C-alpha cells in the first residue's frame, strides 16, 4: 500500500511517499476576497501551498508544506498579477508539530510566524479557531489555488472555492482502511467529482466561521469513494496556543 504526495514545481510533479490531495476540483471561482484569511505560501519561485491567517502574526498550514524559507502572501485573489492590497511577508519562524509523521501524515499541522504583523482590513483578516470539533454533515468551505482537474494539470490564477460536508468517521475509515487516525477527518462527496487536490495543501476548511480542517492528503483527486482527508484542527488547540505564546 502506498499513498503519494504531489507538489507542483513550475508545472512538474514530484512524487513522494504519501499522497497529498491539495487542489479544488469541481468548485467555483471564489468571489474576490470572500476568503480574506486565505494565504499563499511562496518559495520565491511559485505558489507551493495554502494557509490560514489565525492572528495578525501567525499562519496555520500543513506540516508537509514545510520549507526552510517561505514568503506568506496575503490578500491575494489572482496570484499571477498584482491587483492592489496584497501583503507579502517573510516567515520568521516555521514550526512543525513535534509528532508529525511524514509517512502517515499524522499530526500534519504547522505554524508560521510572520516577521512583521499583517495589516488587517477587508482584504486581509483572521479566521477563528474552533470552539469544538465539527459534526458529521457540517457544511464547510474549502479554498485554494490547486489543480482543477483530476487527470493532468490545470492550475488556476484565481482562488477557487468548494462547499462540502464533513463525512462520518466510519465512512472515512472505510474509504482508507488502516490509514485514518484520530487526528484526521474526511470531507467531500463519496460519489466523486468534487475535491481538493495538488496545490491546495495546507489550506483552510472553514465550517460556521471556524477553521476545522487543513488540506492534508487523499487518493486520486475527486475519485469515487476516495474523499479528501484533512487535519482535525480541534485536536490541536492547546499546541497552537502554547506555540504562539512561547514564540
From Swiss-Prot:
The gene is Try4. PROSITE patterns: TRYPSIN_DOM, TRYPSIN_HIS, TRYPSIN_SER. It is an enzyme of class 3 (hydrolase). This is Trypsin-4. Serine protease capable of autoactivation. Ca(2+) binds at residues 76, 78, 81, 86. Pfam families: Trypsin (PF00089). Keywords: Autocatalytic cleavage, Calcium, Digestion, Disulfide bond, Hydrolase, Metal-binding, Protease, Secreted, Serine protease, Signal, Zymogen. GO terms for molecular function: metal ion binding; serine-type endopeptidase activity. Gene3D superfamilies: Trypsin-like serine proteases (2.40.10.10). Binds 1 Ca(2+) ion per subunit. The active site is at 64 (charge relay system), 108 (charge relay system), 201 (charge relay system).
Amino acid at each position: 500500500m502506498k499513498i503519494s504526495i504531489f507538489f507542483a514545481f513550475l508545472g512538474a510533479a514530484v512524487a513522494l511517499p504519501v499522497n497529498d490531495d491539495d487542489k479544488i476540483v469541481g468548485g467555483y471561482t471564489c468571489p474576490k476576497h470572500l476568503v480574506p484569511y486565505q494565504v499563499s505560501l511562496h518559495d520565491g519561485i511559485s505558489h507551493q501551498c495554502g494557509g490560514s491567517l489565525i492572528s495578525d502574526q501567525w499562519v496555520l498550514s500543513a506540516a508537509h508544506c514545510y520549507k526552510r524559507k517561505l514568503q506568506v502572501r496575503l490578500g491575494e485573489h489572482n496570484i499571477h498579477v498584482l491587483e492592489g492590497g496584497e501583503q507579502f511577508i517573510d516567515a520568521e519562524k516555521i514550526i512543525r508539530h513535534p509528532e508529525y509523521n511524514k509517512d502517515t501524515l499524522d499530526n500534519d499541522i504547522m505554524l508560521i510566524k510572520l516577521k512583521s504583523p499583517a495589516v488587517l482590513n477587508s482584504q486581509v483578516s483572521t479566521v477563528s479557531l474552533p470552539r469544538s470539533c465539527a459534526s458529521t454533515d457540517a457544511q464547510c468551505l474549502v479554498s485554494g489555488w490547486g489543480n482543477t482537474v483530476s487527470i493532468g494539470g490545470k492550475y488556476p490564477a484565481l482562488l477557487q472555492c468548494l462547499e462540502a460536508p464533513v463525512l462520518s468517521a466510519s465512512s472515512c475509515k472505510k474509504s482508507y482502511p488502516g490509514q485514518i487516525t484520530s487526528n484526521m477527518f474526511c470531507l467531500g462527496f463519496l460519489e466523486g467529482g468534487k475535491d481538493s487536490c495538488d496545490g491546495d495543501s495546507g489550506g483552510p476548511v472553514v465550517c460556521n466561521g471556524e477553521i476545522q480542517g487543513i488540506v492534508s492528503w487523499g487518493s486520486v483527486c475527486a475519485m469515487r469513494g476516495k474523499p479528501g482527508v484533512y487535519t482535525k484542527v480541534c485536536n490541536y488547540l492547546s499546541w497552537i496556543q502554547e506555540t504562539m505564546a512561547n514564540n
